From Swiss-Prot:
A lipid is attached at residue 29 (N-palmitoyl cysteine). InterPro entries: LppP/LprE (IPR025971). A lipid is attached at residue 29 (S-diacylglycerol cysteine). One of its GO terms (cellular component) is plasma membrane. The lineage of its organism: Bacteria, Bacillati, Actinomycetota, Actinomycetes, Mycobacteriales. The keyword Protein biosynthesis does not apply. It comes from Mycobacterium leprae (strain TN). It is a lipid-anchor. The gene is lprE. Keywords: Cell membrane, Lipoprotein, Membrane, Palmitate, Signal. This is Putative lipoprotein LprE.
Amino acid sequence: MRDVWSLPCRKSLLGVAAVVLVSGTLTGCSSGDSTVAKTPVPPSTTTGTISTIISSAPSPPFATAAPPTSNTPPDDPCAVNLASPTIARVVSELPRDPRSAQPWNPEPLAGNYNECAQLSAVIIKANTNAVNPTTRAVLFHLGRFIPQGVPDTYGFNGIDPAQTTGDTVALTYPSSIDGLATAVRFHWNGNAVELISNIAGG
């Protein structure tokens, strides 16, 4: 009886061993376990490549601003400043143009406003689309608006720098002769503005 059973057992054991061997071979060759993934990369090659790329790249500039140097001059408070917020504030508070009933445009047409002059002025116009809008001068003493005691300044449309000094402003208006302008000088006498003279100019 022992000889009868031994042959089939051997055959079944051989069959099982063959199945195990084939499945082990298939598992070793699966797509998730490739020979490329198992091939080690020498660490010295990768590190050397990365360090070469980093060292050859130019260093980025720093975004921090350079500190100001002592050679940079401060803003001059005595310089002409037609963009001063004082001008816009004063102009916004003026009575409207009597001819058009419109407010005044806060952007000066001309002027020499600064905070240090005994007398300075800006020329403004009515905020209208008229061909010849009303113009006027606004006078300042040490950068502060002079609201009272000022002669009529309507109609002036420019400043003559040749006749203007630290305490005198020469305002101009067109004359009846083309190309000629008339200058009227306003002077700060220490207490108020006074009219000096009319001078015809070119």
